[in-house]
Amino acid sequence: MAIANKNIIFVAGLGGIGLDTSREIVKSGPKNLVILDRIDNPTAIAELKAINPKVTVTFYPYDVTVPLAETTKLLKTIFAQLKTVDLLINGAGILDDHQIERTIAVNFTGTVNTTTAIMEFWDKRKGGPGGVVANICSVTGFNAIYQVPVYSASKAAALSFTNSLARLAPITGVTAYSINPGITRTPLVHRFNSWLDVEPRVGELLLEHPTQTTLECAQNFVKAIEANKNGAIWQLDLGQLIAVEWTKHWDSHI
C-alpha cells in the first residue's frame, strides 16, 4: 500500500518506535496522519507537521483502556472529519510485569477493542469499504522472554488475534498483519520490571546483546506498510525486515 494520499490512524504514534515511525510515515506523504495517544506532546506534533507541511497531522488524547463505546465515539468523530480511513496502526504497549492487569489491558485488550470499534466503520457486511490493520506485537510473541511472562503472553495474544483477523478478511473486508520488533533501544526497555522481581536486571541484560535503533525499526515498519501483505508476520530485528513463516501444529478444520 502506497502511503501517499492515504488516511492513517496511529495509536501510540508518539512513543519510542511510534514517533520515529510517524516521522517516516509523514515523509511518505499521507493525506492525514491522526495520532491517538495517552500523553500529548505538542513539540512532537509540531515537528511532524514541519517535516511535511502537505500532510495534515492531528492529535486526539486516547487511552486504549477506555470502554469500547468511548473508542467507537472517538472514531465516529474521526471518520466524520476524514470520511475514509485506510490504515489503523495499533501501537500501544507497556512493559512492566509488576502491573499485570494493566499490561493485559494495554497490550492486548486495548488492541482488540480499538480494532473492534473500527469494524463498525469498515466491515463490508455493514456496507463498509474494508481497511487495513497493522498491530505492533513483539518477537516475544514467538518465544517469550521468560522473566517477563505477562508481557510476553500479552504480545502472543495480540499476535494470535492479528493472525485471526487476517483469516477473517474474506468475511469482513479488513486485512491485517503484525509488526514484531526485536529488542529496540527505547525508554521501554530501560524500565523493564520482571514478574515477581525474578530478574531485577532483565533490561540491562537484554541491552548487553545486539539491538536495533528506533529509526531502523521505523524504516522497516514503513516497508512492511508498503508491502501490505495480509496475514504477514513481520519480524523487525537488528535492522532487518523478515517475513516469518508460521508453523502450524494444529488445525480446527472449520
Swiss-Prot record:
Keyword NAD listed? The answer is yes
The family this protein is said to belong to: Belongs to the short-chain dehydrogenases/reductases (SDR) family.
Q: Which reaction does it catalyse?
A: a primary alcohol + NAD(+) = an aldehyde + NADH + H(+); a secondary alcohol + NAD(+) = a ketone + NADH + H(+)
Q: Which residues cross the membrane?
A: none
Q: Which Pfam families match?
A: adh_short (PF00106)
- Per its UniProt entry, which superkingdom is the organism in? Eukaryota
**Cross-referenced InterPro entries, in alphabetical order?**
ADH_Drosophila-type, NAD(P)-bd_dom_sf, Sc_DH/Rdtase_CS, SDR_fam
Q: Which GO terms describe its biological process?
A: alcohol metabolic process
Query: EC number(s) in its UniProt entry?
Result: 1.1.1.1
Binding residues for NAD(+), per the UniProt record? 10-33
Q: What SUPFAM superfamilies is this protein classified in? A: NAD(P)-binding Rossmann-fold domains (SSF51735)
Record text on subunit structure and interactions = Homodimer.
- Any one GO MF annotation of this record: alcohol dehydrogenase (NAD+) activity
| GO (cellular component) term, any one | cytoplasm
**Key words, A-Z:** NAD, Oxidoreductase
The record, for PROSITE patterns, names:
ADH_SHORT (PS00061)
Where are the catalytic residues? 151
Does the entry feature the keyword Nuclease, yes or no?
no
Q: Where does substrate bind?
A: 138
- Name assigned to this protein: Alcohol dehydrogenase
EC class of this enzyme? oxidoreductase
